[in-house]
Amino acid sequence: MVISTSADHFFIKAGVFVRKLLIYMITGFTAWLLSYSIIHWIAFPTLTHYQKLARVMARYEYTELTLIVFLSLSLWLFYFQFSRKKISVIYLYLVYSVYLFLLFVVLFAKASHYHSLSLDPFDFFVKDKRIIMEAFLNVLYFIPLGALYGLKTRIAEFVFASLITIIGIETLQYVFYVGTFAISDILLNWLGCIIGYWICRFLRSQMKVI
């Protein structure tokens, strides 16, 4: 009887371990697949169109792999924190430090001695795959920033702060000849911020920062 109970206990623990291991493997593979798709099929082909940024990325042979690994680990670790309904403030600091650095590089290092003005809010509605991909990335880039605002700000504060930030970025790109001041960029970036803000509001109701 004792032996049977001990054996049952062992198999239960073994079953729990195998289940957790399978979850780790499946979520890890899913995070890698999603990261690979975003970086390899969307981000890199679009960003390498800019010669200056392409040269910057080419200086390090493993730029693409590094970005895929970073995004994969970020998503993978986030899943486990979400499942525990707790998120580490250290995780947030590390992820956002890298994110803000990468955002700066993408926004201010992709072009040199170039500026133009576009007042058409829908200039991305064209039959050009690269422009459509870039429009998608303009939304995607700013989702984490919107989530960052969502940690503390109220809706009115978020609207003001996010618009000022985005318009400021567009103005700096134009003034310093490193990009275009485009109404469409402002709208797409702000859409990304809005998505990130509401995602964060939802997550705040489900998780606790520790």
PLM segments and residue spans:
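N-terminal secretory/membrane targeting signals
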Residues: 1-2, 29
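N-terminal amphipathic/hydrophobic targeting modules at extreme N-termini
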Residues: 2-9
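Acidic side chains
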Residues: 8, 184-185
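Low-complexity, compositionally biased segments
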Residues: 11-12, 192
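Bulky hydrophobic segments
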Residues: 14-178, 183, 198-210
